[in-house]
Structures are given as C-alpha cells and as structure tokens.
Amino acid sequence: MQVPEHVVSLYIATCGQNGSGLGSDEKEIILLVFVLLEVSTGQIVGTKQILVRPDGYFIKDRTISSSSDNSSVTNNTASSPPLAIGDANNGSGSTSGNGNSLENGSELILPIAEAQAAGKPLSEAIEEFDAYLRSLSLHDTEIKLVTDGQLPLRQCLHREASAKDVELPAYYNRFSDLRKEFLRYKSGDLARALVPVKDVKKMLQAPTLPMPQSIAEMLGELNISSVEDNDFYIRESRDMVTVIQTLLQAGHKFAANELVNLVLEPGICSIDDEVDGNCIVRARGLPWQSSDQDIAKFFRGLNVAKGGVALCLSPLGRRNGEALIRFVCQEHRDMALKRHKHHIGTRYIEVYRASGEDFLAIAGGASNEAQAFLSKGAQVIIRMRGLPYDATAKQVLDFFTTGDTPPCHVLDGNEGVLFVKKPDGRATGDAFVLFANETDAPKALGRHRESIGQRYIELFRSTTAEVQQVLNRSMDPKNYESGGGHSQPPLIAQLPTMQLPLLPQVGAHSLSHSLGASPANLCPPVPPPALPLPTQHLITSGTTKNCIRLRGLPYEAMVEHILHFLDDFAKHIIYQGVHMVINAQGQPSGEAFIQMDLEESARLCAQRRHNHYMMFGKKYRYIEVFQCSGDDMNMVLNGGLASPVAQPPPPHLGHAHKQQSLLAATTGMFSSAGQSPTTVAAGTAQSPLGGTHTHTHPHSHAHAHATGHAHAAAAAAHHGLSASSAMLPGLSAAASASGLASFMSAGQQSAAAAAHSAASLQNAAVALAPQGYALNPFSLPPPGSAAAAAASTPALLAQQQAQFIAQQSLLVRQQAAAAALAAEQQQQQQQQQQLYASAMLQQHPLYLQQQQQQQQLYASAMLQQGQPQFVLMQRPSAAYLPPFPLSYMSAAGAASGVGVAPGAAVAGAAAAASPSASNSSLSQSMKRSYENAFQQEAAGAAAAASAAKRALTRQPSSVYSYYNSGI
C-alpha cells in the first residue's frame, strides 16, 4: 500500500468535555489545529489553528440532556454563552482571568471568548484548510490525518458536520489513530529484538501492551518532556506533534487506515447467522417516520454493519419508534452508547445495549424468496402499502414510470417487485420495490399517495431487515390461526376482570315480605358478592351467518358512508348493528362488521355489494363484503380468543325475562336471551341521548348508534315501574272495604320504609367501602390490581373508567327514577294515584265499583263497532334521567356533587338485584291490566297483549303513549 508523503496532525477541542468525554455531551467544536508534517524527515511544513464560532445549533429549541456515560463534567457547563471579550494572551495559550476561558481538566484551558469573538463557522474553517492544501498542490491521496484516538473525528467532526449539513473532503474519511500507531510501534520494537530461539515461546506468552489513554502517557513512555511553544493555543496539541515527529524519525510508517463509512450498505441477515452481542445497541424514541438512513445519519462517524439497521414493527406492522443497530466492532458500539440522549431534531434518542438474539429476532430471515430478492444489490428499497389485492407487477412498474413526476425505473423489472402474501397465497396489499441508485429514492417517494385504479398508494423507504421482518410475519401461520400462544393480538384489547364493590345486594326473598317488617331485613349481614365486569362487550354470538364484514374501507369513512354504500340493504341492519373496528393506536383499521336482521339479508348483501365501489371525496375504492357469523366476528375482534358468553337466566324468571328479551332484541346490542336486566339496562343506558352519531368506546371498538333516547327512557321506565310496584303490598280480589284506605296509604308507608332502609344500606356500604372514600357510586375506587395495571397504560385506564362508569350509570338511573317516584308519592297524592292507577290501583274491586259497569258497556260497544281500544300508559319524564359526567370524581366532589333521595338506594337495588320481584310485580300488574282492560277472548287477549308488549319498545311521541291493540 502506498504511504502518503505528508501526514496532518489534527487536534479538535469542544466547548464542553474533552479527553475521554470528548463529544459525549453534544457540545460544539471551537478549535481546529492542523499541523502538516513531512513523512521522510518529520519536519513541520505548516500550521493552521482555526477558531470555530459555536452557533448554538445543538441547543436550539430544546434542553440538552447529558450523556449517561459521562465520567466528569466541566467547571462551566454553559454551551457557548455570550461571554464578554477580554484581552487574550496568545503567547501563553490562555486568556486573562476574567471568566472568559473554560478550564477542562487540570491544565487544559479553552479559548471560549476568542472563539465567540473571532471564530468562523465550521464550513468556513473546513474550507480554509482545504484551500491551504490546494495552495501547496497537495491532493487527497498525498496526505493522511492523524488524530489522538477515535473520538475527534468519529464523535465530533463527522457528527457535527452531518448535523449542520457540512460536506467534508474525502481525506476526512480515512485517518490513523495515534494511540493504535503508538501501540504498534512499541510492539514492533519487541518483535525486532534479538531473542534466543528457546525464549520465543515465552515472548509469545507475554501479556499484550495496554493502549495509551492520553498524549501525556505517550510522552512518558518515550521519555520526552513537553515542549514550550507559545504559538499554540493548547499545549496538548503541540505535544501531539512531538509524539508524531518521534515516531516518524524512528522510521515508523502510518500505514494503517481507519475508515469512516458514509453510506449505509444493504445486507442480508439470516436467522442462522451468528451475531456478536457486543456490537448491538437499541435506539428508542425515534420519530415514526424515520428511515434507516436517518438512523445511520444519527450515528454518522460510526461504522454500521451491512444491513445493520433493523426497524422494529408493532404487532400491526407499523414502526414503533425503536430500532436495533449492529456495528462492525465493539469499539464503535461503545462510542454509540455515548450518544445516549443526543438529538434528532427536537427529540432526544435513548441508546441502550442489546443482544445478538434481539437483532436476529427482528432482522433475521428464513425466506429463500426474500434472500434472492435482497441479493440483487439495490441501493433503495421502497415499501408500498394499500395496493389492490389483485395488483400485478406490471401495474407497479407503470405506477413508477407514468404520470407527471419524473420516471424512476425499477431494478430488474418484474423481478424487482416482491408482493407480501399470507400463507394461503392471498395478498396483503403490501409490496417491496427495488431501485438501483440512491438518486431514485426521492423520485419514487414523490409519488406518495398517487393512485393505482381507485386506491391511493402509500410509499415508505424500507430496509432489508424490514423486508425480512414483514415476510416472516406474513408467512407465519400462527399469526392467522384462531388459537395458539403466538396468535396476533386482538383488535379489541382484553381487560382484566374488574371487581367493583357496589352497594350491597338485596335478595329477592327480602322483597317478598311485607314492608311493615324491620328495614334491617333489606340488608343481609353477609358481604355482597363482587360484581365481575365482562372483559369485552358481547356483540353477538352463534353460528348463524347473519353478519357481514366490510374490508378496504377508507380510514376516514363514517357510518353514513357505509349506509350509503349498502343502499337498500341498510334497512336490514338491526339497531346498533354497525361496528367500526379500530386498532390499538385508536385509528380506524379499514374494516367494519354489520349485524343484519336475517341470514338471507346478509347473504344477498355480500353477494350483490361485494367489490362495489365506495365514493369518498373524489376517489373511488372498491369494498370487499363477506358473509360471516357472530362467532366469526368475535373471533376476529378478540384476536382468536373465545368471546365472553352471557350467563344463563335463573330458572324462576318468567314474564320479567320475556320483557328483558324483548328489550334486548330491540336494542340489537345483546342478542343472547340469557342476559340479566342489569346488563340490558346497562347496554341501553350507554346510548347517548340524541340523534344519529358515532360513539367510540375506549376499548378500541366503535358502535354506530342510530337512536338512543327512546330506548334509554323505555328501559328506565321499565325498571322504575318494576321497582316501585315491588315495594307495594299485594292485592287480592276479596279485599274488604277497609282495605281501600290501607291501600291508599301504602305509598306513604313504602316511602318511609324506603328511607329507613336506605340508612341501613348506607351504613352497610360505608362499612364495606375502603376507608377514606365517601359513599357515592362515583367515589368508589377500583381495586388495587386494576389500578396498578391502569397506571402504566393510559389506554387501559380509559377502558376501566368506561366500564366503571357504565355500571354506575345504570345504578344512578335506577336510583333517580325510583327517587322521583318516591318524591311524587310524598308530595302529591293525586300524582301517586295517577301513576299506579293503570298498573295496580284499578284492580281493586272497591275502587272500580262505580266505574266498572260503565267501562264494560263502553268496551262492548267499541268491540261491536270494530274500533280498537287504547290503554293509557305513563312513562317517566326526562327529568328522571339526569345526565352525568363521564369521568371519575374526587372523593370530596363525589360526597357533595350528586345527591340521591333517601329511597333511591333501596329502589335502585331492588330493581337491579331482584328479578323475582320484577316477575311478581309484572304478573300482578301488567298482565292483569291487559286481561281486564281488553275484556276479549283468550286468543284476542293474547294478541292484544303481544301488541302492547311490542309497543313498549317504540319511541313515545309525548308524555303519554297510546298503544293501539290492533297494530
């Protein structure tokens, strides 16, 4: 190898740490010292000392974070402060004692003030020395830089030049490390010594010489004293020249080259390769749009191995801001760790150690197709996303060569396009494309969001490691199986079961006794069972294929667009039957599930709307429509996990169970007939009061609600009526005349008993609630395990809050409805009679004695004329359903914020926890009122009662609802 005729001693100083911490604190260069020496004689040809003015680039709009590997700090930690200019003494290499210099170590004094005053920008300083070399007719190949270790060039000059977009001449990309050259010089002396043959083995077993750590240590080993030269700002730079001169005069040749790679070369990593774990680091906090070139630029000056940047992907295939970087040796890995909390723009990047197994798990590939694709020697890899599933390689080639933007040709034509497919051969909509030159990258990326057919295509710069990672995931059958421990995570996050200690449960047997008994009977002494919340809303279940799945929706599509796309089939969608799927990041996934009223409707919709186009703005996208079952839908949404199954109803539920099934079928949310009234009411209460809108739940699944006010009011009225009627004593047809007075006063007795019972429940709940929390539904804390899990994940906290509030909203609505009824009983006797006249009071024989004959005659006349009869039914007003905030409340705020009537707790608990009481009240009131009011035959009465039940779920138009028995 040809040895240059001249060497250049390069000394670099920053305004921060120097020595072993040089460049680790991300401070700027303030001094460059160039000394040109002749190799043959060791004489100094010329000297250039250039002060560089720091411009504060590394502290603009951000706070500098110190490195985790810094061993010491300087006395003045300010980065290039605007210091006052004092009289500098260039002869001594220091400034006057006015605080304008930076002492770094025991002897090093940096000319901060002079650099601020007379320094040049870094680009001008580099150009000045390059012009000096040209004036001496010296070319790149005729000189070699010599530095004190690796840090001056790798950690300082190349890093800062890359950040400031300063182009360095080619001779800065190769240099000699003086410390390594000195060690080689000392080892060479031992090798040339005259050693007897018998002692050669001992010499080979001798320990290797340690690497010198400073210029002073080299001077000590050479027995040379420091030279007093007043022409140098820093004495250490002159001592470095002395060491180089000594080696040159001793005949040492600076033949070794330390290279700086400026281009990240692509490479292929097989899963069977052996990777040195001492060469791997993990970078966190990267911008999501960062490419491998951006990461290589962050580590500029350090040599990254071929294909050594592996971008980590999330389970959904998107970049998550992390990357694994593989360097050529441990020395470069150690320097990379010193860039911990250095910056890319305004973001600081964390750098940690990693293992070889971590790198192979991301970058290692086992696909022969990927190996052949990546071995073509392309400099640029572009990832395409959003392709039509039937796209061909010719369409991809035409995409990059046609249009208004400059054409860019794909390497090797069709062979330069690789489509990503699933194990069954179906396309995923992704592809990778190769380009030969780096100049093709901006041309290709300039076609971002242009269209192929009716689909716009997203383009990203990719890496060989990302190609391997994507193909490994796409070809792994475990990612598409319904079971197994390695199945892909669910689109809807699964929450741990959350135990919420609500109010003590009131048994059905307590309500069967007379209200004249002690109120303590309403509060059983045993602690209430914890109420487990389902980990996932049960949307639907079963193998009946009455659902459809839409795929390929625009990310901006709303429920209105889906209804318009389905056209006439939209009328077959059940209530709350449109489910927009949202990914773990809270963004639309482009899919939706829709529940239809019949299996035949779903089949026809999938047959006639499949691959039809949806117009969105000025673009058209074809939508795939598939028929599926409720189990299929839950399997996809839960990531292959079995959907939660509703518990079967108690066997003693009769008419009340039929009523709740009727409500469940109307809402469309709970198709299983085995859900409790509490669950049905909770699902109904979740509907916001208002018109058509989209409600996005915190658990990453959005329900499209078409209506909400009518069903929420109907459910509240149903449960309020059941609770109120359960508190009244039973009636018999053989009651005496004195029973009327006692019956009329039953309202006051029930209200008083409810107030007394509420106090007992209050005391019991206080005893069960944790200390320090007020007794209020909104102040009850979640359990410790759930709170600890939610504290680390904001999304989990939001989901738990939503579940907690959904349960509390049901309880609050029931309590509010019962409280309003109790207040009306106490305030106005006339309103009490009006509320219960149609349900129970009209059944009393004494009360109906004067009007029964007139009603029978009127009913007979109306039946003979063929006119329908009407039953007057009341519903609670909107005041019974007060809105409540969807958030947690503090303990103090909860104690004083929401006030509940004394009887509300008992009424709410009775409505929620006493299905048998609801059954009894309905059988005594509603069923009997239907039979007596219509006075028809058995078949006619059954038809009329069925029509009245259907009308329960219809939206009332005013305060009173009139149900036509003939509908």
From Swiss-Prot:
One Gene Ontology cellular component annotation held by this UniProt entry: nucleus
Protein's GO biological process: mRNA processing; regulation of RNA splicing; RNA splicing
Effect of a null allele: Death during embryogenesis; without displaying dorsal-ventral patterning defects. Heterozygous embryos act as a dominant maternal enhancer of dorsalizing mutation cact(E10) and display a partially dorsalized phenotype.
Signal peptide: none
Any one Gene Ontology molecular-function term assigned to this protein's record: mRNA binding
InterPro entries according to UniProt: ESRP (IPR050666), Fusilli_RRM2 (IPR034980), Nucleotide-bd_a/b_plait_sf (IPR012677), RBD_domain_sf (IPR035979), RNaseH_sf (IPR036397), RRM_dom (IPR000504)
Domain annotation RRM: ranges: 279-356, 380-464
Residue segments, region Disordered: 65-100, 673-716
Comp. bias intervals (Low complexity): 65-80, 89-100
Alphabetical UniProt keywords: mRNA processing, mRNA splicing, Nucleus, Repeat, RNA-binding
SMART domains: RRM (SM00360)
UniProt subcellular location: Nucleus
Compositionally biased intervals (Basic residues): 694-708
Compositional bias ranges of the Polar residues kind: 673-687
Repeat is among the record's keywords: yes
PANTHER family the record matches: HETEROGENEOUS NUCLEAR RIBONUCLEOPROTEIN-RELATED
Protein family (similarity comment): Belongs to the ESRP family.
Functional summary from the UniProt entry: mRNA splicing factor that regulates alternative splicing od specific genes. Has a maternal role in embryonic dorsal-ventral patterning; such role is probably indirect and due to its function as mRNA splicing factor regulator.
Protein's name in the database: RNA-binding protein fusilli
The organism of origin for this protein: Drosophila melanogaster
Source lineage: Eukaryota, Metazoa, Ecdysozoa, Arthropoda, Hexapoda
